[in-house]
Swiss-Prot record:
SUPFAM superfamilies tied to this protein: RuBisCo, C-terminal domain (SSF51649), RuBisCO, large subunit, small (N-terminal) domain (SSF54966)
Recorded family membership: Belongs to the RuBisCO large chain family. Type II subfamily.
Name the record gives this protein: Ribulose bisphosphate carboxylase
Residues forming the catalytic site: 166, 287
Species, as recorded: Rhodobacter capsulatus (Rhodopseudomonas capsulata)
PROSITE patterns associated with the record: RUBISCO_LARGE
Length: 458
């Protein structure tokens, strides 16, 4: 059934919809299956995303028609489809009237993903009007709070030197805590890897107790504050809260040095909101493990990594992993820096829409996945600043002289970039950085030809 006479209004102007402030706008790349017209399929997509189905129903009235989602722009050649969703369509909390991301996803990436006339459809951007934006929690903490704990300026405080304890599984509590201590002697921040939790060989309570002690010892030895991101991911709300409360109690006077990691993609919006609302004084570390199943450019359905990042700021993530923008081992390229800008800036331009965040706190980009001291300068050149949390697992623990030296090499690399000094030149007077060249020779040969002669390495 062709529903374009009801669910398509190609005379609507995007600027007018934005000025009206009553619609969430979504841009998709959509292709109909063979034999289906583009506008007809787009209208069916909008109907399934809002008030319609595949037939007319007798219960529809004038009010219902007034909240139809509307296709307002199509470009069949480029496969671009844009839909305007009235804000009234989205579910609200009964406890406080707040918005919920699960409702946003149910409508914009719901039944429409399985429609028989759609070959593929993937959301590439969305715009949130002020009246709806203000209903989301947004972040309560971000990198500025980490800088405060670390004793740095809360504006432009620079890279937080971090790591992921490796191997990701198989370490018992004491070796895990020992690895934390070793890294903290040179670095700032350690995160649980996403599968680490309460395995039988590494009970959470025992591990956390030893990690808290390792933090105290590292702080005493270095005279510097240290940070730890503890995984509280669980299926059950009460389990997440129980883990969080135990961790804070165990860290005691260092509770404000603790972030909570949640696997936000696999657990969904409910888990992020549980952490955001139960622990508003903790940095909420959004890990996105599994997201590539829908966000990868190889996947033609779902939504992009940019969309995931933008949603995370609405939900209240203090920080989210954004990949390595083509400079590490993860899928991505230099253009992914727009994710960092959308997370971090007061207003930013996405692939299709300009978003003003209206004073909502920033979400911090977290950089991880195959990074080491040699790759950082290129990454910072592309991004334009170093105000990120950078977590190198192999880049720290793969250093020939151990994790302490690995952490120092990462910091020295950032210092060299900020000073505008060539990395090979800087390495001549910084041993840990010089040894990073020997630790990662394949990267060194590719990125810094001639380094062996310059550093006297055979």
């Amino acid at each position: 059934m062709d529903q374009s006479n009801r669910y398509a209004r190609l005379d609507l102007k995007e600027a007018d919809l934005i000025a009206g402030g009553r619609h969430v706008l979504c841009a998709y790349i959509m292709k109909p299956k063979a034999g289906y017209g583009y506008l007809e399929t787009a209208a069916h997509f909008a109907a399934e995303s809002s008030t319609g189905t595949n037939v007319e129903v007798s219960t529809t009235d004038d009010f219902t028609r007034g909240v139809d989602a509307l296709v307002y722009e199509i470009d069949p050649e480029k496969e671009i489809m844009k839909i305007a969703y009235p804000v009234e369509l989205f579910d609200r909390n009964i406890i406080d009237g707040g918005a919920m991301l699960c409702s946003f996803l149910t409508l914009t990436i719901g039944n429409n993903q399985g429609m028989g006339d759609v070959e593929y459809a993937k959301m590439h951007d969305f715009y949130v009007p002020p009246c709806y934006l203000r209903l989301f929690d947004g972040p309560s903490m971000n990198i500025a709070d980490m800088w405060r704990v670390l004793g740095r300026p809360v504006v432009d405080g620079g890279m937080v030197v971090g790591t992921i304890i490796k191997p990701k599984l198989g370490l018992r509590p004491k070796p895990f805590a020992d690895a934390c201590y070793e890294f903290w002697l040179g670095g700032d921040f350690i995160k649980n890897d996403e599968p680490q939790g309460n395995q039988t060989f590494a009970p959470l309570k025992e591990t956390i107790r030893l990690v808290a002690d390792a933090m105290k010892r590292a702080q005493d030895e270095t005279g510097e504050a240290k940070l730890f991101s503890a995984n509280i991911t669980a299926d059950d709300h009460y389990e997440m809260v129980a883990r969080g409360e135990y961790i804070l109690e165990t860290f005691g006077e260092n509770a404000d040095h603790v972030a909570f990691l949640v696997d936000g993609y696999v657990t969904g919006p409910a888990a992020i909101t549980t952490a955001r609302r139960s622990f508003p004084r903790q940095f909420l570390h959004y890990h996105r493990a599994g997201h590539g199943a829908v966000t990868s450019p190889q996947s033609m359905r779902g939504y992009t990594a940019f969309v995931l990042s933008k949603m995370s700021r609405l939900q209240g993530a203090s920080g989210i992993h954004t990949g390595t923008m083509g400079y590490g081992k993860m899928e991505g390229d230099a253009s992914d820096k727009i994710m960092a800008y959308m997370l971090n800036d007061e207003a930013a331009q996405g692939p299709f829409y300009h978003q003003d965040w209206l004073g909502m706190k920033a979400t911090t980009p977290i950089i991880s996945g195959g990074m080491n001291a040699l790759r950082l300068p290129g990454f910072f050149d592309n991004l334009g600043h170093s105000n990120v949390i950078q977590t190198s697992g192999g880049g720290a623990f793969g250093h020939l002289d151990g994790a302490t030296a690995g952490a120092k090499s990462l910091r020295q690399s950032c210092d060299a970039w900020k000073a505008g000094v060539d990395l090979v030149t800087y390495a001549k007077s910084h041993r840990e950085l010089a040894r990073a060249f020997e630790s990662f020779p394949n990267d060194a040969d590719k990125l810094y030809p001639g380094w062996r002669v310059a550093l006297g390495v055979n």
